[in-house]
């Protein structure tokens, strides 16, 4: 015991020496889950290992809506918390209040260069949002409880489960009911992150490998996520095992890259999620290090900008899986470092949102005399470079520093502007303007900035702007024009700057076109006795934004979209759509400098483009939508009103799936409307010399406008022999004068596939394929069947079967008939996708136990789930690579195709049993270090294995009777 303790203390003391900077943009990082391991060590022991870069502590496994009496979420961190929970008005909550080891170890991990995230979700269907507002409130609570400590939170004595420890981000391992709330929640987190600008926080997500992932596809498409570690295990057809086997159209990392590129953050890093041992996932999904290396090499080389590394489920499994004397995680680290010798990269961590870049430098020199009349001529040249990747964010910063001189003849000022769009090449542009003028004079610089996004090479030109000023008989003229031929978004600017400037900035977007106009006035002071000028400019930028519709089709591209999502409170669960444009959000902000010779006015404009996917749809028609916004010019604030009007959007996408699409329902829906948005989100002013101006955006949205019509009609069929005759020799139990007796009988069963029928209903999805989420793979049905035709079940009292009269249930054959026709289809309980389930499952008592064909206990779909039929989804259905159980436009559930079987288990009376949450009603710390029942992103197949055990128990009871 003492040597072990000494080793642990030594490991902790060595954390500082092992510290290395975390690099979010690296392609050889390892992320791991912690909190659900069997007899897991302390967090600090894993942080003492050099292999891990990100550690997700899981889970927050229920939300306030599931705990209405306390209004607090629930948690489960395994054996790392005491049994105490927070109490609200005398009622104990599900949120553990004392987790001292984690509270002590998080700062140590961070000192060692690790990032620690708090993970939400897990493998139990005990969490969901009923409203969007609930997701906002939960984000605020988690930020207060696990984010930076604030005085307001402390004074209110609100929960801090990890004490003063602060997590580095939040992870979403959402496996049930994920269609509502999560995109909004991530956006809310992003806003709260802005409250601590000197610290970087991250968002990660762990979807299943099927595309679209039914739980997180909406969030990935609409909210900025930094890391996506796909669970490439426990789901047949898209797992890493399919890569090893060479399955055609199997391992789908390439498709996930496309999902990332079409999402809200095309610069997100994509990790390969793998089980850390054979026991961490279903049988067959574990990959040896020798199998992992070629996979990592191929995709690290193919997508060096997107590949982020490997995610492992989970830390304790990795440590226990010793290979050549080291843990599995160390083997994976060796592979990553071998293939990426430059790790860690020399660059600094990027900001979470993408920022492409161009640079414009403008230098102005002015020569002044005391002449009463002057003429100012300004010319400017512009070089424009276009970037190929989609621009996600454009940030423009302009700084002007006029420098007065005591000399009567010269004054100079310089302007440097940096525009930062990012995916890649840094296009640069420069312009130099020189002018000679006589004092007093007034000149007007013109800044014209025209980002354009077009389908075909076109050019847009800003009309010349001219101004004249009759001060002292002087006049000035400035003109600018911009020509931007490009196929992809590009930014160009023409800039003419003078010493005493009225700053005019015009920004034109080819989708919704807007102009951004700012003005500032500088007044030179002259001395009447000395022919010299002392320049003391006073600058007051005023920003106004005037909407303009696209001028012509040749110089701008029209926004065309069939589905749009524009605000936090409006999310679309449609995972696949065709869009030929982007939705643009912009947040202009400006700073108002003090009037002094060293004034540095700075104007920042952020333009975020959210591209939408344009694949997986074979036919479709959309109509143009026009987005316009008007912004009044004010000196103290910025208000933006946006209106989205959609005339009519009709979309008829069609898709097909290579695996059964189970619902056989026909439904159509049509909705037409318009979205009026008044953005309401606090802006972040950017200032270099102090500013009291705040850009405010206020948003109120109805549902995005889209009109769609379609029907889903999928009719699974099977091909079987015309008639199957089965002769079964079986036995049943009856009563004779001396007690129970067993009678052997013969049953001849004739099965005709043409007359077979099947039905399926849906309820709590607790027996999904482990780790694959609700809906992304079929639930494990409760198998039932009719008793043979003519057989009857009776209840009687037997006086000779035991010491006392005993009530027994008997299933007896008919007296004269031995033939019956059996149903080829069992009835299964499959999940509902509305997120409103009660979270309970049924436990059944088995009466008749003829076994069905197939293996229902190995964590894979029940018999017939993969019978090889190919179904085609009607227009309007989503593409999926896995069976879709139940669901549809009307919520009806239809039959699941199964192969024929002679008998099925017959459940009798049911009793409702609550679904275990997390590792049970209390953490494993109160159970002597026992393993949690469910393991989040890991395997859930142990639950499925309980079905055969139940059958065996029932048989043994019958035998005793």
Curated annotation (Swiss-Prot):
Start-end of Low complexity biased regions: 356-510, 519-544, 552-604, 612-635, 666-720
Protein name: Endochitinase A
Prodomain residues: 937-961
Keywords: Carbohydrate metabolism, Cell membrane, Cell wall, Chitin degradation, Chitin-binding, Glycoprotein, Glycosidase, GPI-anchor, Hydrolase, Lipoprotein, Membrane, Polysaccharide degradation, Secreted, Signal
Similarity annotation: Belongs to the glycosyl hydrolase 18 family. Chitinase class III subfamily.
PROSITE patterns, A to Z: GH18_1, GH18_2
Signal sequence, start to end: 1-21
Disulfide bridge map: none
Disordered as annotated region, ranges: 338-720, 767-787, 813-842, 912-933
Xref: InterPro entries: Cts1-like (IPR045321), Glyco_hydro18_cat (IPR001223), Glyco_hydro_18_chit_AS (IPR001579), Glycoside_hydrolase_SF (IPR017853), Glycosyl_Hydrlase18_Chitinase (IPR050542)
Superkingdom of this protein's organism: Eukaryota
Mutant phenotype after disruption: Decreases the frequency of germination.
Residues bearing a lipid moiety (GPI-anchor amidated glycine): 936
């Amino acid at each position: 015991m003492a040597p072990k303790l000494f080793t642990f203390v030594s490991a902790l003391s060595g954390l500082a020496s092992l510290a290395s900077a975390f690099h979010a943009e690296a392609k050889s990082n390892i992320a791991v889950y912690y909190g659900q391991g069997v007899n897991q060590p302390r967090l600090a022991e894993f942080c003492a290992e050099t292999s891990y870069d990100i550690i997700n502590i899981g889970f927050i496994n229920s939300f306030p809506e599931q705990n209405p009496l306390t209004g607090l979420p629930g948690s489960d961190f395994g054996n790392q918390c005491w049994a105490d929970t927070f109490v609200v008005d005398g009622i104990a909550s599900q949120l553990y209040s004392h987790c001292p080891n984690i509270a002590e170890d998080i700062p140590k991990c961070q000192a060692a260069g690790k990032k620690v995230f708090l993970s939400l979700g897990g493998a139990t269907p005990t969490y969901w949002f009923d409203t969007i507002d609930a997701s906002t409130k939960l984000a605020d609570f988690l930020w207060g409880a696990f984010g930076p400590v604030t005085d307001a939170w402390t004074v209110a004595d609100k929960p801090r489960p990890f004490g003063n420890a602060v997590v580095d981000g939040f992870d979403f391992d959402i496996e049930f009911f994920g269609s509502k709330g999560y995109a909004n929640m991530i956006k809310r987190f992003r806003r709260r992150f802005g409250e601590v600008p000197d610290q970087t926080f991250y968002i990660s997500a762990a979807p299943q490998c099927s595309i679209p992932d039914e739980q997180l596809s909406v969030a990935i498409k609409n909210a900025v996520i930094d890391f996506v570690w796909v669970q490439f295990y426990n789901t047949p057809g898209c797992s890493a095992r399919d890569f090893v086997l060479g399955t055609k159209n199997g391992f789908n990392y390439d498709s996930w890259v496309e999902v990332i590129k079409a999402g809200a953050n095309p610069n997100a890093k994509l990790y390969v999620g793998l089980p850390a041992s054979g026991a961490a996932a279903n049988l067959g999904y574990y990959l040896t290090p020798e199998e992992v290396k070629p996979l990592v090499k191929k995709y690290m080389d193919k997508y060096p900008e997107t590949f982020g590394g490997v995610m492992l489920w989970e830390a304790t499994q990795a440590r226990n899986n010793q290979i050549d004397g080291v843990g599995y995680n160390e083997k994976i680290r060796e592979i990553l470092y071998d293939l990426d010798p430059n790790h860690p990269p020399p660059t600094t961590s990027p900001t979470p949102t993408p920022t492409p870049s161009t640079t414009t430098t403008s230098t102005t020199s002015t020569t002044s005399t005391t002449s009463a009349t002057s003429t100012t001529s300004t010319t400017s040249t512009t070089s424009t470079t276009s970037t190929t990747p989609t621009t996600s964010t454009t940030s423009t910063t302009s700084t002007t520093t006029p420098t007065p001189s005591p000399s009567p003849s010269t004054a100079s000022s310089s302007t440097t502007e940096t525009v930062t769009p990012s995916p890649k090449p840094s296009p640069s542009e420069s312009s130099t303007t020189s002018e000679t003028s006589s004092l007093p004079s007034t000149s007007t610089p013109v800044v014209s900035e025209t980002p354009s996004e077009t389908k075909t090479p076109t050019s847009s030109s800003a009309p010349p702007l001219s101004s004249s000023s009759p001060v002292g008989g002087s006049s000035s003229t400035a003109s600018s024009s911009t020509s931007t031929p490009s196929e992809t978004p590009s930014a160009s600017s023409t800039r003419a700057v003078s010493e005493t400037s009225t700053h005019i900035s015009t920004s034109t977007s080819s989708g919704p076109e807007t102009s951004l106009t700012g003005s500032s006035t500088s007044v030179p002071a002259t001395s009447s006795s000395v022919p010299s000028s002392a320049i003391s400019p006073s600058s007051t930028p005023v920003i106004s934004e005037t909407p303009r519709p696209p001028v012509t089709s040749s110089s701008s591209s029209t926004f065309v979209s069939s589905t749009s999502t524009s605000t936090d409170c409006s999310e679309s669960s449609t995972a696949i759509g065709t869009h030929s444009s982007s939705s643009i959000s912009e947040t202009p902000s400006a700073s108002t400098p003090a009037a002094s010779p060293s004034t540095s006015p700075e104007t920042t404009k952020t333009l975020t483009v959210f591209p939408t996917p344009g694949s997986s749809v074979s036919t479709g028609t959309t109509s143009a939508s026009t987005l316009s916004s008007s912004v009044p010019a004010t000196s103290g604030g910025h208000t933006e009103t946006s209106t989205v009007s959609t005339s009519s959007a009709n979309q008829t996408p069609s898709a097909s799936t290579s695996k059964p699409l189970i619902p056989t329902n026909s439904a159509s829906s049509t909705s037409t409307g318009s979205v009026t948005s008044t953005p309401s989100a606090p802006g972040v002013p950017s200032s270099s010399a102090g500013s009291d101006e705040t850009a405010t955006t206020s948003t109120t949205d109805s549902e995005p406008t889209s009109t769609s019509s379609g029907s889903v009609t999928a009719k699974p069929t099977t091909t079987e022999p015309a008639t199957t005759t089965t002769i079964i020799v079986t036995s049943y139990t009856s009563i004779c004068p001396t007690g129970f007796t067993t009678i052997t009988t013969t049953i001849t069963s004739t099965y005709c596939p043409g007359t077979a029928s099947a039905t399926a209903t849906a309820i709590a999805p607790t027996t999904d394929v482990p780790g694959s989420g609700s809906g992304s793979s079929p639930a494990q049905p409760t198998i039932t069947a009719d008793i043979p035709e003519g057989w009857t079940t009776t209840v009687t009292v037997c006086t000779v079967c035991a010491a006392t009269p005993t009530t027994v249930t008997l299933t007896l054959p008919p007296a004269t008939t031995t033939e019956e026709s059996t149903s080829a289809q069992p009835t299964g309980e499959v999940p509902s996708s509305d997120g409103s389930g009660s979270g309970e499952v049924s436990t059944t008592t088995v009466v008749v136990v003829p076994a069905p064909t197939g293996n229902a206990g190995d964590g894979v779909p029940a018999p017939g789930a993969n019978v090889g039929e190919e179904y085609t989804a009607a227009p309007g259905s989503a593409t999926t690579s896995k069976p879709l159980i139940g669901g549809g436009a009307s919520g009806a559930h239809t039959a699941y195709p199964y192969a024929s079987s002679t008998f099925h288990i017959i459940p009798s009376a049911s009793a409702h049993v609550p679904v275990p949450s997390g590792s049970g009603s209390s953490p494993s710390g109160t159970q002597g270090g026992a393993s949690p029942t469910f393991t989040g992103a890991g395997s859930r197949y142990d639950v499925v294995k309980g079905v055969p055990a139940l059958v065996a128990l029932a048989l043994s009871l019958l035998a005793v009777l």
